[in-house]
Amino acid sequence: MKNFRVTNRNKIVKLFLGSFQFSVVIVLLATLMTTMTSAQVNIKVGGGLGVMTPASDLGGSTMEYYNGTNYGLSGGLNIHAKAKIGLVGFNLTGEIDYSSLSNSGNSEPGQGAVDISQKILSLKIGPEFRLSMPVVPIVPYLGINLALNSFSGETTFQGVSKVPSATYSVNSATRLGIGFAAGAEVSIGPLLSLDFNLSYNLMNVSGKEWNDVNPGINQRIDSYLSLNDASDPLYNFDDDKHFVSKARSIQSVLFTVSVLFGL
């Protein structure tokens, strides 16, 4: 019980520190950018749909997920809301993304059924630097953002040899990340535009950790009950209960189309 309280206290402290760091950066960035110019700003808000494709260790197969090498997810849909504050030469952009990823397959060749689902909620803020194209109603841009990413989901094992058959919830986890974007905003009216955006997202740059939700019990299933993007501190080559040997990088490619309304 003592270890459980300490573990949860550490999780709360880490989450608070991560959220505090993110908030400080947002405030400083917003203050800096709004004081860089005294020109009148323009504001656009809207939202849209997109497609997220896993990259690095976020993708792979269900067998790789079962073996602890990556998360075994395939592509999924994204919905989002976006706001832009237009300043001289750049936009200050904020975005809320919700993406749903999943995959199904075997735990071993021809054996065991595994269904994985992952939900990712991301809060992003950063500048977009506009590239001038006179006369043409298209404004290309390059952007960078700081992101606070929240992960949750569930996994179902059926007929898997080393894990009891059941559906398991995955503990939510929060990580800080960075994204790089390129896009174009196409004007289709005085106060209406379409925003096409392609971004590459490093989603767990900061905050990787290993969380054993049942520290008093030595069982394989615990490795799947949290995000566990750090290596298992109890990893042993011959131990089938502690098999995650290295930290895992969570990255993605996201393509979105947004409808923006000028205010």
Task: Describe each PLM feature range.
Residues 19-35:
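Bacterial N-terminal signal peptides
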Residues 39-86, 247-263:
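Short glycine/proline- and aromatic-enriched beta-strand/turn motifs that initiate or cap beta-hairpins
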Residues 42-44, 89-91, 137-139, 179, ...:
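Membrane-spanning beta-strand positions in outer-membrane beta-barrel proteins
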Residues 45-53, 92-98, 142-148, 184, ...:
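Transmembrane beta-barrel strands of outer-membrane/channel proteins
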Residues 51-61, 100-108, 148-156, 202-210:
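Gram-negative outer-membrane beta-barrel proteins
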Residues 59-69, 107-117, 162-170, 241-245:
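Extracellular loop and loop/strand-boundary signature of outer-membrane beta-barrel proteins
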Residues 82-163, 171, 252-263:
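Gram-negative (and chloroplast) outer-membrane scaffold detector with strong preference
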Residues 189-263:
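Predominantly the C-terminal beta-signal and adjacent terminal strand-loop region
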